[in-house]
Amino acid sequence: MALSTAQATPFLHCEVTYAGATQVVHATPVADPYEVAPVDIAERFLFKVVMTATRGRLDHVLIYTYLQQEPRPVLLQQAKYFAPFKPRRQPVLLTGEQHIYGGPIERELIYRCWLGGIQP
């Protein structure tokens, strides 16, 4: 995993895998967390990352995983990470490897996210 640390803005780099296909989701802090749209994962899951910061300092990271179904998506996991975040030279694996299961046949979504750009 080669990620640049030249960015001064905090960021989260996630690798999300379903059915052998991996998508990369990149997130940075937003002013309005309600405007963050989830990322569609093979029309089976939704993956959403919300980061907020105050005066350049990261306040929290929220990661939501939903199962897509009718009449509306169902929340499977909400992961919360709160400040303080330790400054590091390289991005650090924040989430570990997460395995999420959903639906009647227990479809598996796997993700892991690295946090970087944290300034002292």
Regions found by a protein language model. Give the residues of each.
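Mitochondrial intermembrane space
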Residues: 9-120
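Sec/Tat signal peptide C-region and signal peptidase I cleavage site
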Residues: 3-8
